[in-house]
A protein has these predicted regions:
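Substrate-binding/catalytic cleft of secreted carbohydrate-active enzymes
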Residues: 1-76
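Carbohydrate-binding surfaces of carbohydrate-active enzymes
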Residues: 40-55, 74-173
C-alpha cells in the first residue's frame, strides 16, 4: 500500500501538476505486481497549519472534484484497485490533543464531508469512482501492458461545411 499527496500536502501555494504516475514501472509496484495496489492514504484535503494565511475553505478549492476525477482515472489506468481517502470526514480537535504545527482546532482539511457535516462537491467524484469499480470488477484483475506504438498518418486536406441561415459556408483545414 502507498500514501499519495500528488498536488501538495498543504494549500499554501500553487498546486503541483498532476503527473501520469506510471505506477506499472515503479519498483514497489513491480515487486508486488501480483498483489492489489492500494493507496492507503489518498489525498482528500490539504493541511492547514497554525497561523497560516489560508483555511479549510481554501483547501477545499485546492483539492476539488476536478482533481479527483483526473487522479482516479490515472490511478485506475495504472492498476490501483483500492483507495482510502484521508481525510474524508472533517472534524474538530478537542482537548489539546493536537500540536500547533498540526492545525487549528478544526481538523477539516477541506475534506469531502466538512467539519459541520456538509457534503462538498468532491464527494460525488469519489463516489463516481467507487461506482465505476463496482460496475467493472474486472479492473482488479487486469494486467498492465506497454504503451502502444504511435503512427503519424497523414492524408488529404479535410473540408467541412457549416450550414447557416444565410447559406452554406466552406472551411478548409
Amino acid at each position: 500500500s502507498y500514501d499519495d499527496y500528488p498536488i501538495r500536502f498543504d494549500c499554501s501555494a500553487t498546486r503541483h501538476k498532476l503527473q501520469d504516475h506510471n505506477w506499472h514501472i515503479d519498483p514497489a509496484f513491480r515487486a508486488a505486481h501480483h498483489s492489489p495496489h492500494f493507496i492507503a492514504e489518498a489525498q482528500d484535503g490539504a493541511f492547514t497549519p497554525w497561523g497560516a494565511s489560508f483555511n479549510a475553505s481554501a483547501c477545499e478549492k485546492f483539492v476539488d472534484a476536478n482533481f479527483y476525477r483526473q487522479w482516479a482515472a490515472l490511478n485506475n489506468g495504472a492498476g490501483v484497485t483500492a483507495f482510502n481517502y484521508y481525510m474524508i470526514f472533517g472534524g474538530t480537535n478537542w482537548g489539546w490533543t493536537g500540536s500547533a504545527h498540526s492545525g487549528f482546532t478544526s481538523y477539516d482539511y477541506g475534506a469531502s464531508l466538512s467539519e459541520d457535516r456538509n457534503l462538498r462537491d468532491k464527494l460525488s467524484a469519489q463516489k463516481e469512482n467507487g461506482y465505476f469499480h463496482r460496475a467493472f470488477p474486472q479492473l482488479t484483475v487486469m494486467d498492465g501492458t506497454t504503451d502502444p506504438t504511435v503512427r503519424d498518418v497523414r492524408g488529404a486536406a479535410v473540408k467541412s461545411y457549416l450550414r447557416k441561415a444565410a447559406g452554406l459556408h466552406s472551411l478548409s483545414m
